Amino acid sequence: MSDEKTELSDLFKLTHELVCIPSESFKEKAIVDFIADKLSKAPWLNITRIGDNIVAKTGEKTEKRLLLGGHTDTVPAQGNDQIRLSDDSIWGIGSADMKGGIAIMLSLALNVPDTAVDMTYVFYAREEVAHKHNGLLEIEANQPELLTADLAILGEPTSGNIEAGCQGTMRFTLELKGERAHTARPWMGRNAIHRLSGVLAAISDYESRNPVIEGCQYREALQVVKVEGGIAGNVVPDSTTLTINHRVAPDRNLETAEKEIRCLLEPFMEAGDKLKVIDAAPPAKPGLSNPILTSMIETHQLDVQAKLGWTDVAFFDQKGVPAANFGPGDATLAHTSNEQVERSSI
């Protein structure tokens, strides 16, 4: 019991150290230098640094390889850059998302040289910004073999539950046209914003699918997230644009999802209107049949649920590597002014 308490105390301390190192996206060098220095003390690891990404691998001693991955960056500060520490919790930006998970990865890499399967630890940059900047893509472009594994587990905050797969995400813009006129003579024009009434009703009434896949219930969603339009207080607007977010369950692909949304919205469109996909990231299958993941769930009696958001498990799924989310911290606290991680969760 004494050794267990010491180990937990060290993990908590390491998490606090990591939280104290600012690492907003594109500014991760300091925290990556810290991690690299720690890893250099483990002679059983082969370490590769590519930009602000680090991959540490054990040798090939078994027939299976497990990859543990985590991003080192955080979102910009929003009132949570003042770090607080109590006996039970650490408050601060990145504490839940995901420096508790990074601390666990780093501790395992440094303290467990003899593992049941071969290990790959991936500390990567720029997850919290547009996907094109993601450090995993930088690693793949330079040395893709470093990301080969039989299973990938990302240490995103899941409150210690397995969150299987992930839902895909798509963003659309819908631009509707009108005709400009003076508001004193609206019959001489056509109000583009008024044309939104039918579109908004259709989206509000949209019945989302809730498929159960490998025992996990996913919940698709369709939401308007932005409305743009208007010229001046006395002008009938001749254009308006909606931004729409669609979450896609992993039992179908993005092409099928796009066709459905186009079928939903095209009845409200006319010549000159435009519906565009401006961003898309695919879903990932649950992967619960993977023997390493199955053994882990059964041995530790872990709860399993669907991942409703999008994470980089989709990157690995696209590479043919089953992947899941599993880490300390409450995801609902991520990116908030009250972001924190509890000792018990770590």
Language-model segments: which ranges?
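Short glycine/serine- and small hydrophobic-enriched flexible loop segments
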Residues: 17, 107-114, 198-205
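Acidic/His- and Gly-rich active-site-bordering loop/insert found
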Residues: 2-95, 330
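Metal-dependent amide/peptide-bond hydrolase catalytic core
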Residues: 3-6, 23, 157, 164-165, ...
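Acidic/histidine-rich catalytic neighborhood of metal-dependent amide-processing enzymes
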Residues: 103-171
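Glycine/serine-rich anion-binding loops at beta->alpha junctions
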Residues: 89-104, 182
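Hydrophobic/aromatic beta-strand patches that form the interior of the parallel beta-sheet core
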Residues: 66-68, 122, 153, 324
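Acidic-glycine-rich active-site phosphate/pyrophosphate-binding loop
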Residues: 73-86, 149, 164-175
